[in-house]
Amino acid sequence: NLVDADDELVAVVNGKFGRRFKRIAQRHCEVTAVEFDWGNPIDVDAVAAAVSDDTEVVTLVHNETSTGLLNPAKEVGEIAADHDARFIVDGVTCIGGDEFLMDEWNVDIAVTDGQKALAAPPGVSALWVGEGVAKHLDGENAPFYEDLDWHRRKADQHQTPFTSAIPLIRGLAVAVEEIRHEGMGERIGRHREQSAAFREAMEALGLTLFAQCNDVSDYSNTLTAVRLPEGARGEDSDAFFDAVADRGVSISGGQAHLGGDIFRVSNMGNLTTAQLARGVRTIGEAFNEVGVDADTAAGVDAVETRLR
């Protein structure tokens, strides 16, 4: 909708979902990828060096859940705006659970899904398209279903271009009403406190966080990535994940080349302190079961003390 085949796009990549954004763009235009090792913070100077007045679009995943890192949307947005480039941000795992300032960050298009921090059923997505970028849309060059001009016209009529997924939209409406009831500020604060408590708990267990932060990148407030310790890495990780599942708790492993190296735990949605403490206890007990020393009591105490 925003590029032709010979247009230039800069994709910022430091995880699986940034890489996916890059691969999507490569099907439609010329792409310059500014890539960093997964889990490492973004060097905004490197991004600034890659973006020029010829750049049409800059893409960024704000909350990279493959690594548990919150990327610097504000700083990258300023770079895009300095060159009059459109700024497209993947906000899938932060919108509804963390701050997302579209105007202040110069965001032109934001993307999210229902099933992440909004805590709605999977299957429904949403785009926010800024008025300033609407005039740049060219639906004729987009796949038929993804013609944003068409979607915008239908949205003005409170419709979708094709048959609406009414049950999913109603589910999303209920989830949004729950957010309204809690209050957006309170919800963001809760996610931040819960993620901080979980990180403290992992360190109390004797574990090491995976993401590397700097002055403009920070830990994700909706998901934590943790290094698997010796004795539960690589092929040995299967026994750990089985021990967690046997206790009725669901966590995720690393994606792509990080499989067997890390595990990931989400605190998106409507978790309680008791649920978070149960998750920490389960992780500690699972490590102990497979022969890894973890101070389960200290981990649970860290969560309960922080969130008391």
Question: Residues of each region from the PLM?
Answer:
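Conserved PLP cofactor-binding pocket of PLP-dependent enzymes
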Residues: 247-264
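Active-site C-terminal subdomain of aminotransferase-like
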Residues: 115-204, 308
